[in-house]
């Protein structure tokens, strides 16, 4: 059913990437490979966590949800982009654009909340090990994930409803490869001050506040380690937190650089590069980060492969 907006615009044109037509095949192959790696890698993480009882812990519970979110996050933008990357611009209907905006914001915020929950889990494991099992109970972990879903859904719904109230000018070309909310607001003929206020407020609540909580958590972890600076303790902390810190740096580095730092002269191209980093590259790298630097994940993978070999015999 057609959304009730104040605009006669029936579709938008996504300009996609600033590339030459002959480069379309290369970009199609590249992004298709990255998307397949994202889906298969994160599905493997979910499978390993489900099958290996040693991974039925709070940290891996959050990781399985993060893997699902990463698959969904990339799936919001990449498949649509792949269908027309060799024949830009990319047409997208008004309804599809609003829906894409909703799910993009939803999974982006959910990613942020889940990464924060994982930092809280690491903080409790290192700073309060005696109370860890009691505090990080199965019900507590499920509650953290459920609250993350509810808040992310509410934020995305608010942005989408406000977007649907806007009128759009004759120019309906979006200088991006997906329906980016900021780019859409620039095309509007309506007053977008309320939208901008909500973006700023929600950005603080969904991105900057979780990032601050992560920094505080790791600050407390570092302080705890330095109180008893043994080589074994430092190595254990790095093993426990190293993978998560890498994900934090990739995800928040891209988003903060895109939305919270002063714009540069080549703002459009920089926006596209930063968006590719946190919508395509980061979800693709997460399985490698968590598997290559994690003994438990590597052990679970070896057991799965050994079982497969025995079954084939």
Swiss-Prot record:
InterPro entries: GPCR_Rhodpsn, GPCR_Rhodpsn_7TM, Olfact_rcpt. GO terms for cellular component: membrane; plasma membrane. Keywords: Cell membrane, Disulfide bond, G-protein coupled receptor, Glycoprotein, Membrane, Olfaction, Receptor, Sensory transduction, Transducer, Transmembrane, Transmembrane helix. GO terms for biological process: G protein-coupled receptor signaling pathway; sensory perception of smell. Belongs to the G-protein coupled receptor 1 family. Residues 47-57, 119-142, 218-240, 293-313 are cytoplasmic. Odorant receptor. This is Olfactory receptor 1J1. Pfam families: 7tm_4. It comes from Mus musculus (Mouse). One of its GO terms (molecular function) is G protein-coupled receptor activity. It is a multi-pass membrane protein. It is found in: Cell membrane. Glycans are attached at residue 5. The chain crosses the membrane at residues 26-46, 58-78, 98-118, 143-163, 197-217, 241-261, 272-292. Residues 1-25, 79-97, 164-196, 262-271 are extracellular. PANTHER family: OLFACTORY RECEPTOR (PTHR48001). The lineage of its organism: Eukaryota, Metazoa, Chordata, Craniata, Vertebrata. Disulfide bonds join 97-189.
């Amino acid at each position: 059913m057609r959304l009730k907006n104040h605009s006669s615009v029936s579709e938008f044109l996504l300009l996609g990437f600033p590339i030459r037509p002959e480069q379309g095949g290369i970009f199609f192959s590249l992004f298709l490979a990255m998307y397949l790696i994202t889906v298969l890698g994160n599905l493997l993480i979910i499978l390993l966590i489900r099958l290996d009882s040693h991974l039925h812990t709070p940290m891996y519970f959050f990781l399985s949800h993060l893997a699902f979110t990463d698959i969904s996050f990339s799936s919001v933008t990449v498949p649509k982009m792949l269908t027309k990357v060799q024949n830009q611009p990319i047409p997208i209907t008004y309804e599809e654009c609003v829906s894409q905006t909703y799910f993009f914001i939803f999974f982006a915020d959910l990613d942020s909340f889940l990464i924060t929950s994982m930092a809280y889990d690491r903080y409790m494991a290192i700073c309060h090990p005696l109370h860890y099992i009691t505090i990080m109970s199965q019900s507590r972990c499920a509650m953290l994930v459920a609250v993350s879903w509810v808040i992310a859904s509410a934020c995305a719904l608010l942005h989408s409803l406000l977007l649907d109230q806007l009128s759009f000018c004759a120019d309906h070309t979006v200088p991006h490869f997906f329906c980016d909310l900021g780019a859409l607001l620039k095309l509007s003929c309506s007053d977008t001050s309320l939208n901008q206020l909500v973006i700023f407020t929600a950005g603080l609540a969904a991105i900057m506040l979780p990032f601050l909580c992560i920094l505080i958590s790791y600050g407390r972890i570092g302080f705890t380690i330095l109180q008893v600076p043994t080589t074994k303790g430092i190595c254990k902390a790095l093993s426990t937190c190293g993978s998560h810190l890498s994900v934090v740096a990739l995800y928040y580095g891209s988003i903060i650089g895109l939305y919270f730092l002063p714009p540069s002269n080549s703002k459009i191209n920089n926006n596209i590069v930063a968006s590719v980093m946190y919508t395509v590259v980061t979800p693709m790298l997460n399985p490698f980060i968590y598997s290559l630097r994690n003994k438990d994940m590597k052990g679970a993978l070896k057991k799965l492969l050994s079982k497969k070999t025995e079954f084939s015999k």
